């Protein structure tokens, strides 16, 4: 499984967190099994390969982090979505941005450009071109402001 596929699965799981009552650990335990991937692979090629240990660890780290920092990430999204209330942003778009912002803030081993570019590419699969531009603009502003040297 590629890092991009693992990231897209993390986005899907972050999206699922938006409307499930399951604890994040329970959700991950149920979704990251070979059996779960095998059953989903019939309908979705993204699940053709179950994640190995490294990719499974990455997915868990991201999804658990997004869950733990959801309020902070949502506040960042709303702060950079000038003129938009968070509640108006599509759930898929917010999941994409949460994952990218979590990577930028808490995973220094991932280059910011890789996090943003991958997020935009994932968004292109699920959102309209206008929403993709919106996501790209928010993430670009976020990275410039949040990673700028502080004086």
Enumerate the predicted regions with their spans.
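N-terminal interaction/assembly modules
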Residues: 1-132, 136-151
